[in-house]
Amino acid sequence: MTNTVQIKINRKPEVLAMTGLKKSTFYTRIKEGLLPPPIQLGSERTVGWIEHEIQAVLAAMCAGMPLIQIKELVQDLINQRTKF
C-alpha cells in the first residue's frame, strides 16, 4: 500500500474564514513568519494556501505554542513542500 497525501488548496476567502483574521492581519502574520506564504497556481496573481499547513499552524496556536516555535513550524512546513 502506498501513502498518498491528499493536497487541498484554499483561496484567500476560505483561509480568512478558517483563521478568523482580517486581511491586513493575515498578511502581517505571513510577513512575520507566523503563517505559511501562498503557492502560485498558474499566473502570478493566482495563489492559494495548502490547507494542511494552515490547519497545522492553527492547531499549534490552539495548543498555546510559543511564537518562536510557530515560526519554526511554518519554516518546516515550507521546507516540506519540496518533498511532494
Give residue ranges: language-model regions.
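Polyanion-binding surface elements
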Residues: 1-29, 56-63
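Short Lys/Arg-enriched helix C-cap and helix-to-coil transition segments
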Residues: 39-46
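A short, Lys/Arg-enriched interface patch at domain edges and termini
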Residues: 53-84
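Short, solvent-exposed alpha-helical "recognition" segments
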Residues: 32-39
